[in-house]
Each structure stands twice: as structure tokens, then as C-alpha cells.
Regions:
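Repeated scaffold domains used in trafficking and secretory/extracellular systems
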Residues: 10-19, 55-65, 100-112, 159-172, ...
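Beta-propeller blade signature
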Residues: 39-43, 82-89, 133-148, 215-222, ...
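Short, conserved, GDST-rich strand-edge loop motifs in beta-rich repeat architectures
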Residues: 30-31, 120-137, 207-212, 291-295
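An edge-strand/N-cap motif at the start of beta-rich repeat modules
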Residues: 1-46, 396-397, 401, 407
Length: 410
């Protein structure tokens, strides 16, 4: 178990993906300008093949297809452009989905025949840079053909939100701490974690009050755009594809610490008293490192049993954690507290590498060929050699959702 290479990118890394387990890597990062998006093609030794810079929104957006074509979303004039970058760095086809001047792409997913996009109000940075009025359009989800033709568009009504753990204090409460009454969000954005997932004939699109952190997930029919169901307002959390048309929706904060499984009808079929970066294997078993906003840590690696109970794995120190990957033997690998850790099927933990590092911005772990594991820490990419086997096949985040970083289960 060795650190085989490490290399620095122009800015904080937002995404690392590859179309082939042997590389090269396609890295999406910020540039020196926080509104710039930089795309870098680099091999596992750190040798750069090409690099391109795009205007951004403060939220670099990209998705990699199975053939190695990267799609980048960025503002262009008064609209938004989806541009493809071919494996050699040249420009491929583009799509210009119709939108309002004050809208931007909050998240998108590549489909086999087009795109699904979550639209939100343009970021404050972009609106201020362009001297635009601070209008706040309602969010929406839309599906497009490959050329950009809109097939359907569905408005999202987040509505008034509230949660029992949210409190307020002021003149209205006589300066006493009381539960906050339901409120209408002033600004709505896509959720920070896994905001848009597509599985079989269902979409899970998550939107949140950007100031209060209370949000909802909306389940839509992929073919028609019809809203099938929506979760109740709750603190946002990690999410995953749990199977065809099925999703895991987590909630963490204000006293919430749960994960629910939802079927294709949007009905909750299971709920666990745990929240984390969960893996779902080919048999539908769920496990992963817990993520809780507290120190000292009381998190563990947990297995979420079918009867809604928890199976305890090893205790986890520290706080900041990468999303894990899993090999075909069922061993999970992830970065936490300055260590590269594995947890095997017996729930035994093993430390593969450690260094004094407390960086807070950590990308997901990618498991590549010959046991190579890639993790990004802030503006740096680290490549490790490990004894792990090939990447497992399963709904999340194995297979395409792991390597390509495109949350789609066809």
C-alpha cells in the first residue's frame, strides 16, 4: 500500500472521473478565478495531456459519458450551453437548452439519448457580475433530446418549509427560543449532495432553502415529467440510487439523522436511524461510513439491515470523509481523518495509508484497475496502490456512477 503519485490542479477539485479503469482521469476544478471552470485530462502519474478553461457560475458542472466524452455546462451570453469535449480535448457537439436569462443549470445528468436538467435561479456571483436584477424564478426540472430540444419541463413548488428542530428568537417570540413557524424560502437552490439522480423510469430531484438548509426531494416520471411524489421538508443529506426506480434519501441536522428508502411510487419502504455515504451492492445491501455534524465523532461504518435495524461496524475518528467505493469482494475503501481505510465484509477495518492532513474538501474515492485508488483533497489528487480487487457492480456508486460520475442507472 503506497502513495504512487500526487499532483496539483489549478484550483479546488470539484469532480474526478474516467471512462476507463486504467485512466486517464478527467478532472473538473475551479481556476484562479472562482467563476472559471478548468477541465484537465491527466494520467495516473500526473502527466497532463490537455487542459481547457471555461466561464463558470461558481459551481463547476460536468458529466462524463461511457465513451470518454465530457459534457460541460457553462453560461454563454444570456443562456446556458452544454458543450462536449472529446477524449483528445477537441470540441464536439453542443446543445443550447432554452432557459430564462436569470436561470442557470443547477445540476444535470446524461441520459442515453439526452439530458435531464435541474434549473434554478442564477447564482448571486453571476447576477452581480452581469448587473442583473435579483429575480428568483421558481426551480424546474426538464428533459432534453441530445440536440437540446425540450421534451418536457416541470415546475417545482417547494412551498413553505419547516422542521421541528429549527428554532427562532426575536420580537415575535418575546426573545424566547421557540420552534420556527413555517416559512417561504427567499432563495431556492439544488441540494449540495447528489441533487439529481436518474434510475430506470424515475428521477429524484432535490431542492433546498439555501439559507435554512431545509429541502425536499421530488420524484418525477422520466418519460412524462409528471411529479409522482415528494418528501416532506427536512434537513438535507446524502442520497443514492438503491435500484431501478429506487432511491436512498438521507437527512442530517437539526436533530435529524436518518436514511429512507423510496420505491418507484415515491413511497418510503424503509427507514434507518443513520445517515452517511452509503454503498448499495448488487444484492441491494446498504452500508457505508456515517456522516454526522459533530465532534468528537460518534460515527461508525454501518450496515443498514432490511428490518430497519443497524449492524455496527468499526468506530470512525475525524469528520471529513470521501464517498466510498467497493470492490467485488465487498470491501469498501474511503478517505477519512487523514487515512485511507478499508472495511471488509466482516466489518473489520484496515488502515492502508496515513498522513497528517485535515483538508475539508474531499472528493469521492475511485477504484481503478490493479487496485489503484484515487482521492482528491482540495486542489490535489492522490493515487494509491492497494491490494483491492476490481470495482464491484451494483446500483451505487459502483459501475458507471462511480467511474463516470454520472448518477444514472439505465
Amino acid at each position: 500500500m503506497t502513495l504512487s503519485s500526487r499532483f496539483t490542479l489549478p484550483g479546488q477539485v470539484q469532480a474526478v472521473a474516467t471512462a476507463d479503469p486504467s485512466g486517464p482521469l478527467t478532472v473538473t476544478s475551479y481556476g484562479a478565478n472562482p467563476l472559471a471552470t478548468v477541465i484537465t485530462s491527466v494520467d495516473l502519474s500526473g502527466t497532463v495531456a490537455w487542459q481547457r478553461t471555461y466561464p463558470g457560475t461558481g459551481r463547476p458542472q460536468s458529466r462524463l459519458s461511457t465513451d470518454g466524452t465530457l459534457w460541460v455546462a457553462y453560461p454563454d451570453g444570456d443562456g446556458q450551453l452544454l458543450e462536449s469535449v472529446l477524449p483528445d480535448g477537441s470540441t464536439g457537439p453542443t446543445a443550447r437548452p432554452e432557459c430564462r436569462p436569470d436561470e442557470e443549470i443547477g445540476a444535470f445528468v446524461l441520459l442515453d439519448d439526452g439530458f435531464v436538467i435541474s434549473w434554478v435561479s442564477g447564482s448571486r456571483l453571476v447576477r452581480e457580475e452581469r448587473n442583473r436584477p435579483m429575480s428568483v424564478p421558481e426551480p424546474r426540472v426538464a428533459r432534453y433530446a441530445q440536440e437540446g430540444e425540450c421534451l418536457w419541463s416541470t415546475q417545482i413548488a417547494l412551498g413553505p418549509v419547516s422542521f421541528p428542530g429549527v428554532v427562532e428568537m426575536g420580537d415575535r417570540t418575546g426573545w424566547e427560543i421557540r420552534p420556527r413557524r413555517p416559512w417561504v424560502p427567499e432563495e431556492i437552490g439544488v441540494d449540495h449532495w447528489e441533487p439529481l439522480l436518474a434510475s430506470a423510469d424515475r428521477i429524484a430531484a432535490s431542492f433546498t432553502d439555501t439559507r435554512g438548509g431545509i429541502g425536499r426531494t421530488f420524484f418525477l416520471d422520466l418519460d412524462s415529467g409528471e411529479t409522482v411524489s415528494a418528501t416532506s421538508p427536512a434537513p438535507t443529506g446524502r442520497k443514492a440510487i438503491a435500484g431501478p426506480g429506487q432511491f436512498l434519501i438521507g437527512s442530517q441536522g437539526y436533530g435529524a439523522f436518518t436514511t429512507g428508502r423510496f420505491d418507484r411510487n415515491g413511497a418510503e419502504t424503509a427507514r434507518w436511524a443513520s445517515h452517511g455515504a452509503m454503498l448499495v451492492d448488487k444484492d441491494g445491501r446498504v452500508s457505508g461510513p456515517e456522516l454526522e455534524n459533530r465532534l468528537p465523532s460518534r460515527s461508525r461504518f454501518r450496515r443498514l439491515a432490511p428490518d430497519n435495524t443497524l449492524v455496527d461496524g468499526p468506530a470512525l475518528t475525524g469528520y471529513y470523509t470521501s464517498y466510498p467505493a467497493m470492490d467485488r469482494e465487498g470491501t469498501a475503501v474511503f478517505w477519512r481523518d487523514g487515512k485511507l481505510l478499508t472495511v471488509d465484509t466482516d466489518l473489520a477495518a484496515h488502515e492502508l495509508f496515513a498522513m497528517d492532513d485535515s483538508r475539508a474538501v474531499i472528493g469521492r474515492a475511485l477504484l481503478l484497475s490493479e487496485g489503484s485508488v484515487v482521492v482528491s483533497l482540495d486542489d490535489e489528487v492522490l493515487v494509491f496502490r492497494t491490494p483491492l480487487g476490481p470495482l464491484a457492480q451494483g446500483p451505487w456508486p459502483c459501475g458507471e456512477a462511480n467511474l463516470q460520475g454520472n448518477p444514472l442507472l439505465s
